Amino acid sequence: MMVTLVTRKDIPPWVKVPEDLKDPEVFQVQSLVLKYLFGPQGSRMSHIEQVSQAMFELKNLESPEELIEVFIYGSQNNKIRAKWMLQSMAERYHLRQQKGVLKLEESMKTLELGQCIE
């Protein structure tokens, strides 16, 4: 399926028009994770685009999970590499969150045990 969805006007110079704007790689991520990936107000997005030689577009999805759809444009290799990189960063964020929750649970149990001993 050859779909072009680009609405951005500031297409980076490394993206070839129109061939790189067809068939974007797409994945969904929670808005909280997106802030981790791209920084506050997307401050790191242009840097990540430049490093990955790809272009990103974001689309809010009406969902209770506050999902954002990320469209990745560029050459086939750059799209796949950028998607892998972003998904890996998102997975790392989730693992760090889980570790934090586990540490918090352990601390809570320790506090509860300490209160029982007193």
From Swiss-Prot:
Gene Ontology MF: a single term: mRNA binding
Phenotype seen when the gene is deleted: Mice develop normally and are fertile. ES cells derived from these mice demonstrate normal morphology, proliferation and differentiation.
Major localization listed first in the record, in broad terms: cytoplasm
Family annotation (Pfam families): MOEP19 (PF16005)
GO biological process, one term: regulation of gene expression
CDD domains linked: FILIA_N_like
Lineage top rank: taxon: Eukaryota
Record key words, sorted: Cytoplasm, Developmental protein, RNA-binding
Induction note: Down-regulated by retinoic acid in embryonic carcinoma (EC) cells and in developing germ cells.
Residues in KH domain copies: 24-86
Subcellular location: Cytoplasm
Coiled-coil regions, chain positions: none
Tagged with keyword Kinase: no
Keyword Lipid metabolism listed: no
InterPro entries: KH_dom_type_1_sf (IPR036612), MOEP19_KH-like (IPR031952)
GO annotations of cellular component type: cytoplasm
Family membership: Belongs to the KHDC1 family.
PANTHER family: DEVELOPMENT PLURPOTENCY-ASSOCIATED PROTEIN 1/5 FAMILY MEMBER (PTHR31368), DEVELOPMENTAL PLURIPOTENCY-ASSOCIATED 5 PROTEIN (PTHR31368:SF4)
Biological function: Involved in the maintenance of embryonic stem (ES) cell pluripotency. Dispensable for self-renewal of pluripotent ES cells and establishment of germ cells. Associates with specific target mRNAs.
Protein name: Developmental pluripotency-associated protein 5A
Annotated organism of origin: Mus musculus (Mouse)
Lineage: Eukaryota, Metazoa, Chordata, Craniata, Vertebrata
